[in-house]
Amino acid sequence: MKKIVFLISLLISFNNGFGQDWITDSNFDDKIHEKSAFGDDEMSIVIVEFWAKFNDANAFQDWDKVKGITHYYRIDIAKAPNAKKEYRIRMAPTIIVFKDGIKEEMYKAGLDLECPVTLDELQEHINEIKSASQF
């Protein structure tokens, strides 16, 4: 029984380490500074998607295919006025890439409210961040 509980808790911690979760104003700063679930000392790359219920169809769909990130979060702009104001979010979806808690790149939706970035573009930028940090 202990082995089953251990395996389930390990699976949950693994999924929480690389999944997509929701964040709010109250935990936003903690989450963008978050490190890997494995506790390594490598840089932390966190992606936050500012999301709106009315535009869910245009949200970034390939978050589970992005490689080299610590975590991917969504934040509902209707429930996060402070983060929305701080990062000057006007349209959803807007996607921000943070490295060690510092904003590296921002992709903003236009008037068409389409997702502002493709998987390939996002992956290329993440790879650039990782390459630049190796020196």
Show which residues each predicted segment covers.
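Solvent-exposed loop/turn segments at secondary-structure junctions
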Residues: 53-56, 78-82, 103-104
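Local sequence-structure signature of Cys/Sec-based thiol-disulfide redox active-site neighborhoods
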Residues: 22-68
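Sec-dependent N-terminal signal peptides
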Residues: 4-13
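Structural alpha-beta junctions
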Residues: 66-81
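Structural micro-motif
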Residues: 87-99
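Non-catalytic, surface beta->alpha helical segment in thiol-disulfide oxidoreductase systems
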Residues: 97-135
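Structural recognition of the beta-strand scaffold that forms the well-ordered cores
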Residues: 46-49, 94, 106
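Sec/Tat signal peptide C-region and signal peptidase I cleavage site
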Residues: 15-19
